[in-house]
Amino acid sequence: MKTLLVGYKVQDLFEADRRGERRPVPWLEGDITCHTLDIYHCHAIENSSCGVKAVCSPHLPKDDWDLVKFKTGPKLMSGELSLDLLQEIHLLHPKRFELEFGGRERDRNDLLSKIKDDPDRVRDFSAVWPASVPGGQKLMLTSFPGCFCHRRVDDGGLALAEVVARELSAAKTFNASALQPFNILDMGCGCGLVGFLVAASQKLPVRLVMVDSHTRAVEAAKLNAEKLGIPAEVLLSDNGTPAQMDDSFDVFVGNPPYYSDYRIADIFLETAQRALKSGGVCYTVCKNADGLEPVQRRYFPDVEIIRRRGYAVLKSVKN
């Protein structure tokens, strides 16, 4: 039997036996594929011993599925992403469907009714919205459910873009020859808000590399690069940039997640330390510098804090 799992993570595929040892859950039988939207979760499943194939893609794989199991709920993903994935499952026409819903029965029924009440309707869940920095052109950016800050500008990202665009423009005004061509690395790029705003604000050519672990973010960033006419190399990665890109960037920008005790921020900043040239500048942003500043100082001893829009932009120079 061919089974597709949607919304499951590696911890959902194991249970503890009587001795407390981890073993695969008993229902993992047959030809099972687990779809993930994030390459980190894909790698976690691949490196486990559960015997499940992992696929990481922005959309569900098309096949003649005997069973599709979907795990979702308000604490697992946004309602819009749940509905988007449920619609994709409906369009796959699996022989059987099972929903594991972590939430109220009323919310479960409401989610299912959106498909059952109008089964022939195919919704477009993408969003297009404007963003700009002072003195820069207005960009129309596209995002998809699952992207960070889908349908709206993230204030922290906008604060970061405004500070970096302003500082780079001033630097080029006074020392343009030393900064040409300009190489920018945007890590955790999402749909590309920060990278594209900074690149579009500069008069001199910019080489833009963007990295994200989420396939829908990568899909959106590639689409926006093409639509905006801003050349960008967009990479799907949960471990920063490849070694051949070390010591090659003038500027690093990142808006690292605050959860997981800043472990993801460590990956961001370790990448920045590797990827920047000597004299390159690392910019990160957070709501409160108290948590991120000590992490950044582990990689860059000197940290300057620039306040913008109620956020703290942390600036460091690689020695």
Question: What are the residue ranges of the model-derived segments?
Answer:
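Conserved SAM/SAH cofactor-binding pocket of Class I
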Residues: 1-50, 155-254
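Conserved SAM/SAH-binding loop
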Residues: 57-60, 236-243, 310
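Conserved proline-anchored active-site loop of SAM-dependent methyltransferases
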Residues: 67-79, 187-195, 249-261
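N-terminal auxiliary segments of SAM/dcSAM-dependent transferases
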Residues: 74-134
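A short glycine-rich, Lys/Arg-flanked "PGG" loop and its adjoining helix->strand segment in the class I
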Residues: 83-94, 266-278
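A short helix->loop->beta-strand "cap" motif at the edges of active sites that frequently abuts
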Residues: 93-97, 205-206, 280
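Class I S-adenosyl-L-methionine
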Residues: 105-129, 147, 288-319
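SAM-dependent Rossmann-like transferase core, predominantly class I methyltransferases
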Residues: 113-178
